[in-house]
């Protein structure tokens, strides 16, 4: 029986999710359709309701609706609750369920490059993207997790929820790290958070949650120009999609060759 999935967001035209899920479908021999839905700021909740009334099996949610999807759900996973945002929805026993697969997607992609245990990790930015990855990063048992933001107060809000982290402002960054994660939106507008030279002097591994299929993001290029190994978030996108696919279909697809295909497009 043909299963129906979609991703909703605004903008949505450039989403790679339909391509990724069709690749998963071919690999696992599941018949499905996966559509793009342009989110309507006024009618978003009605759009969610209509999708499932019309026999939708699962829905991915992207910017700017993850918080509204979270609030709409009746049942949430622990990681979804801690993230305060949802990117994966489905119906079960007539109740809307929600999960957030971004964090596990990041961890799985990062594991290709380095071990997180006992590492010093810096997250740039204290918005929703940062909040969504803190819990899974803490589960990996780093030596230290620091969140840096332009305004310290916003970082302190995260610290109140996650007391295990330390916070600072960009201006006060002085120490070195093993891993730096850009969770700001700067790359989306081709801008860079300029870091003090001493922060990059030990050549930390640098990871940008944003991705650009054709070229490097601004942050990745900035880090590479300073001698650091750096990658963008395309692998995270594929891994979070695989986790959503597993939630909906109870089959975990293989991601390595799909990521390689996307990189070669």
From Swiss-Prot:
In its UniProt record, which GO terms are filed under biological process?
amino acid biosynthetic process; aromatic amino acid family biosynthetic process; chorismate biosynthetic process; shikimate metabolic process
Catalyzed reaction equations: shikimate + NADP(+) = 3-dehydroshikimate + NADPH + H(+)
Q: Which UniProt keywords apply?
A: Amino-acid biosynthesis, Aromatic amino acid biosynthesis, NADP, Oxidoreductase
The molecular function terms of the Gene Ontology recorded here are: NADP binding; shikimate 3-dehydrogenase (NADP+) activity
- Could you state one GO cellular component term attached to this entry? cytosol
**EC number from the UniProt entry:** 1.1.1.25
Per UniProt, NADP(+) binds at: 125-129, 149-154, 209, 233
Presence of the UniProt keyword Nucleotidyltransferase in the record: no
Could you name the active-site residues?
66
Decide whether keyword Amino-acid biosynthesis is in the record: yes
Per its UniProt record, what Pfam families does this chain match?
SDH_C, Shikimate_DH, Shikimate_dh_N
InterPro entries reported for this sequence: Aminoacid_DH-like_N_sf, NAD(P)-bd_dom_sf, SDH_C, Shikimate_DH, Shikimate_DH-bd_N, Shikimate_DH_fam, Shikm_DH/Glu-tRNA_Rdtase
What is the top EC class of this enzyme, as a single word?
Answer: oxidoreductase
Where does this protein act, in terms of pathway? Metabolic intermediate biosynthesis; chorismate biosynthesis; chorismate from D-erythrose 4-phosphate and phosphoenolpyruvate: step 4/7
Gene3D superfamilies hit by this protein? Leucine Dehydrogenase, chain A, domain 1, NAD(P)-binding Rossmann-like Domain
- What family does the entry list? Belongs to the shikimate dehydrogenase family.
Assembly and oligomerization: Homodimer.
HAMAP family associated with the record: Shikimate_DH_AroE
What the entry lists under NCBIfam families is as follows:
aroE, PRK00258.1-2
> What this chain does, per the record?
Involved in the biosynthesis of the chorismate, which leads to the biosynthesis of aromatic amino acids. Catalyzes the reversible NADPH linked reduction of 3-dehydroshikimate (DHSA) to yield shikimate (SA).
This chain belongs to the protein called Shikimate dehydrogenase (NADP(+))
Q: Which gene encodes it?
A: aroE
């Amino acid at each position: 029986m043909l299963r129906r999935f979609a991703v909703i967001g605004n903008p949505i035209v450039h989403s790679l999710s339909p391509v990724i899920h069709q690749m998963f479908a071919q690999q696992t021999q599941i018949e499905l359709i996966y559509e793009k839905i342009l989110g309507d700021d006024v009618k978003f909740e009605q759009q969610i309701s209509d999708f499932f009334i019309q026999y939708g099996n699962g829905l991915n949610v992207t910017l700017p609706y993850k918080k509204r999807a979270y609030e709409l759900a009746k049942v949430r996973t622990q990681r979804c609750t801690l993230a305060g945002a949802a990117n994966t929805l489905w119906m079960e026993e007539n109740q809307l369920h929600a999960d957030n697969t971004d964090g596990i997607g990041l961890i799985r992609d990062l594991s290709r490059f380095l071990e997180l245990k006992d590492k010093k990790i810096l997250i740039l930015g204290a918005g929703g993207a940062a909040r969504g990855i803190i819990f899974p990063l803490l589960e990996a048992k780093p030596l230290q997790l620091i969140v840096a933001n332009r305004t310290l107060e916003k970082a302190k809000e995260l610290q109140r929820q996650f007391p295990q982290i330390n916070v600072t402002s960009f201006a006060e960054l002085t120490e070195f790290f093993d891993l730096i994660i850009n969770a700001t939106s700067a790359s989306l507008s081709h801008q860079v958070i300029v870091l003090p030279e001493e922060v990059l002097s030990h050549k930390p591994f640098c990871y940008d949650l944003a991705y650009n299929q054709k070229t490097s993001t601004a942050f990745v290029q900035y880090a590479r120009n300073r001698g650091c190994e750096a990658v963008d978030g395309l692998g995270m996108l594929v891994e979070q999609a695989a986790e959503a696919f597993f939630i909906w279909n109870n089959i975990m697809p293989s991601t390595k060759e799909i990521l390689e295909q996307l990189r070669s497009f």
